[in-house]
Amino acid sequence: MSDINATRLPIWGIGCNPCVGDEVTALITRGEA
């Protein structure tokens, strides 16, 4: 489960760290778009 948690850390990080959330959101947006 450590791998799953590590993969979901960025997702949870969005709510904890706005700065990290912006970077993750940008990557997700580029990936989907």
From Swiss-Prot:
PTM annotation, UniProt: Processed by the macrocyclase-peptidase enzyme POPB to yield a toxic cyclic decapeptide. POPB first removes 10 residues from the N-terminus. Conformational trapping of the remaining peptide forces the enzyme to release this intermediate rather than proceed to macrocyclization. The enzyme rebinds the remaining peptide in a different conformation and catalyzes macrocyclization of the N-terminal 8 residues.
Signal peptide start-end: none
GO MF annotation terms: toxin activity
Residue positions where 4-hydroxyproline is found in the record: P18
Residue numbers of (3R,4S)-4-hydroxyisoleucine PTMs: I11
Function according to Swiss-Prot or TrEMBL: Major toxin belonging to the bicyclic octapeptides amatoxins that acts by binding non-competitively to RNA polymerase II and greatly slowing the elongation of transcripts from target promoters.
Protein name as catalogued: Alpha-amanitin proprotein
